[in-house]
Amino acid sequence: MKNFAFIFARGGSKRIKNKNLQKIGQESLLEITLKQAQKIKNIHKIFLSTDSKKIAAAAKKHDIEIIMRPKNLSRDKSSEWFAWQHAIKHVNKKFKFDKFICLPVTSPLRSKIDIENCIKELNNNYDIVITIQETNRNPWFNMVKIGNKKRMEIINKSINKTIDTRHRAPKVYDMTTVCYVAVPNYILENKSIFSGRVGAIMVPQQRALDIDTPFDLKLARLLYPKT
């Protein structure tokens, strides 16, 4: 059984310039992710999908295969699902593989066990496995939106009873960007993660940080040496 890891890193980033090449400690986010993938024994090959020559050059030092991504799949509003499909089609021209493993560059605090647990969990009759964490917010209890006449209202009103405590609300979780593992054909034949059988691995909050803002980057730099 062949397991291939894919790292997707665009050159453009609105909130943090050159985000994927920002350093946490002595290494860039890209380098950290590449080394995390290389430490997993049952990952047999690693690919980088990017539209950036600068990112590609940085990755080549680590002896991985580069997939140059078309510009139409690299815009701010481009769905990464289509980038996944593009990468799988590219690899399928040369190799056949059984598990697609995506390691987003923006989650440098992940551990080896998080990745290994996701790879194993796919064997339990799932099409794709995601990672989740406990959340402090709940759309039935303390998350609101602006409704008619700019009045605030609870996001989800589908339950026909008043929920006045967090414990009475349905249990919900945050999706994280720690790791995704899927059957390659599932990605090729569907349009989104939740089109089929979705499994999940719980990740503790301290390993689930997703770097999206300058504040997230500062927090990662504080936490990284301690993980």
Task: List PLM regions with ranges.
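Short phosphate-binding loop-to-helix
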Residues: 47, 53-100, 109-113, 117
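Short, high-confidence coil segments that cap the C-terminus of an alpha-helix
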Residues: 43, 95-97, 125-127
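Conserved core of the sugar-phosphate nucleotidyltransferase
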Residues: 82, 86, 108-197, 202-203
